[in-house]
Amino acid sequence: MWIGLVGSEMCIRDRLESLNIFKKPKTSKLSYELDDLSKKYLATSARKNIQKAVDFADKAHDGQFRKSGEPFLIHPINVGIILAGLKMDGDTIVAGLLHDVVEDCEISLKEVKKLFGKNVSNLVNGVTKLLQLDEKLIDQGQAEYFQKMALATAEDVRVVIIKWADRLHNLKTIEHLPRDKQIKKSKETLELYAPLAHQIGMHKMA
């Protein structure tokens, strides 16, 4: 009887592990990497706010997974790492960590503002608007118009930088998408985002 119970428990755990329930170590490692980068140039208060954003994003995206099967949290932390690598300010990194919480989770801008301040909520809102613009203007003939509208829509250039960091990490994991979506995303990046990155001086990332 005990053997049967133990066997059943192991089967259940194996099933849960296949669903990524227990796969937290990689996100923890990425969090340490983000902190190592940020502590080189940011004050302790900013780093604490970044960790607060990591914890908030972890709860907001709980149960969400990437196409790769990895916890969704891996994506916003990688966006944060890219931004920290560019030595962006703390609010920009926090907004990068939270850039999907309003669009993909039941989180309001009001809540983001209450917890992280108006500056961060404005950046998150800007990224959300840019995403909506992206979806409307993906045709080849509208690339130049997209660049103009993106800069006009994003009152703060940091919005564009966050969106580019988001796109950059998505490209690094593009192999997990169906072939047609890989082609679509690559085309969008080359025609819409790469020229935009050059316009704002992000040559190394473009």
Predicted regions and their residues:
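Single conserved hydrophobic/aromatic residue that forms the stacking wall/gate
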Residues: M1-I12
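Active-site helical microenvironments for divalent-metal-assisted chemistry
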Residues: R13-A206
